[in-house]
Amino acid sequence: MCGIVGYIGQSDAFPVLIEGLKRLEYRGYDSAGVALIGNQDNLNVYKTKGKVSNLEAMAADKDCSGHIGIAHTRWATHGEPSAANAHPHVSMSGELALVHNGIIENYQVLKEQLADKGYTFKSSTDTEVLVQLIDHYYQQNGKDLVSAVCQALNDAIGAYAITVMEKKDPGHIVAARQSSPLVVGVGKDNKDFYIASDATPIVEHTNKVVYLEDGEIADIRVGEELNIINLEHASCSYTIKTVDLDISKLSKGGFDHYMLKEIYDQPNCLKDCMSGRLIVDQEHPENNHIVRSALRDYRDRLVNAKHIIIVACGTSWHAGLIGKQLIEKMCRKRVEVAYASEFRYVDPVIEPEDVVIAISQSGETADTLAAIKLAKEKGALIFGIVNAVGSSIARETDTGVYIHVGPEIGVASTKAFTGQVTVLTLLALALGHEQGTLDDADYHEMIEELSEIPQKMEKVLEQAPMIKSLALMFTYAHNFLYLGRGMNFPVALEGALKLKEISYIHAEGYPAAEMKHGPIALVDQDMPIVFIATHHQLYEKIISNMQEVKSRNGRILAIVTEGDELVKNIADNEIEIPKTQNALIPLLSVVPLQLLAYYVAVDKGLDVDMPRNLAKSVTVE
């Protein structure tokens, strides 16, 4: 991992590749590199540890000519972050260059076999093994690159997205994928082709793309139609799709960081998410309804399902925990929330009548994709909740809903979380009303309340200056505890995750009642305790939990419902959110926690958008 860019065509390749890498910086990385076949048919490779800007500076006085090239941002999986381990990797013959996302699981065996044939290695990566393996077959079969790629990939076990080029033919480039995303952009009259891990580096050049499927190889030649085959050389049909992606949404829009922009984007993002789905009639609330297009084709299976399994990772898993409570309350169905990374390895009980909901911002999360493939094999209906249109998970599911919050660039997810929770709320409302477990009055009232969330979220954002001041009091801390109950317990988990992701402060989220079963031993005046203490059915109980902390000299920051005087008498500091229905509280209570994490990290002088060791899209298991 993490980001691939390739170009072949009539333009100078280097600017296209560098700008493409910059578009992919949000995915997270620790090194970067580029390879070009120059105007004199020389293969030039430049690699460096650190930022794309470092690579750009390094290449400033180098030969960057040529109309074909490949580039990569690497997030270390095999081998430490270094220039030697950075991609592209070049074959020992010097004739091939390759970039790769994924993990070749049997690389050690392949490496030993190649070493016996005289191959030597300059890095400790699985990627270099792959390019040497391709080169081995390339030298054997008369330097037919496509055949060599097919033979090598038949030997390789694991996940990959690769792009490879050959020095002898600067009009030819080959790309392939297996369990790792890869997109090919098609220029006018096939005069230019663009390759990338996702569409963001491509859309400023062309909106015509082909999403490669598992086991497919793209054989690309300038001026010719795109040719896609499988590993047995059989031709594969494909569809050129039109991508609708607003490039302006990829900018910071005047904010210091993408993360802050995306926090402030949330009111408008939720309006977009609900647009055309949530119909509100102010004069006649009895006409309020949800457009149920996602339920239409699979209505009976969704209504009749007795067991729903939600699979997700990270922030999406926290959204799934909220979805569980929403669906169980409104639809009276049994819901299980599983870590996608663990799901396949516990021999899960999945019946053909079950529904599996997969949640992923990128739509490319490897563990989630593998989980739904298993569930599909067992006959379950797969329902996707993703942000990235055309992504692997979106294509693998039977039905689903896009959250439509626009590209999320900051590694720490914000607007995708609230978008996912909004879609889960829409799903629970629609399904509950469809099957009669949610009565008309509650259904219509909830729709009206949900439509008001963006406006209420704006009121929360107005408190950002105060939250910024509060954050200054907490940068000293080495540990945080986040506590909530009911719908606010997943919010506590999400708040803790945001803080640890970008500020590198250890933080844990717990159900508030579990505090007395261990975490209370940590409470002292140096450990901030964040309570999400809004009005809900467990309000009195969380007040009791706060008193327990207060009696042990704990420092309390509370998220409270506006007008709450009781909590103010206990907490050291508080942040108010507007009143709303219990089921919708997470959409508001999470926003102050996002801002708190952001301002703590900024005060510590950290790179908020690209925190260390993290990748935006985790495309390896």
Identify the function of each model-found stretch.
Residues 1-252, 256, 261, 268-307, ...:
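Conserved short alpha-helical segments that host acidic/polar catalytic motifs at enzyme active sites
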Residues 4, 98, 164, 175, ...:
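Structural beta-sheet core signal
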Residues 50, 67, 71-84, 281-300, ...:
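Glycine-rich oxoanion-binding loops at beta->alpha junctions
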Residues 182-188, 192-209, 315, 341-375, ...:
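Glycine-rich, anion-gripping cofactor-binding loops and their flanking helix/strand elements
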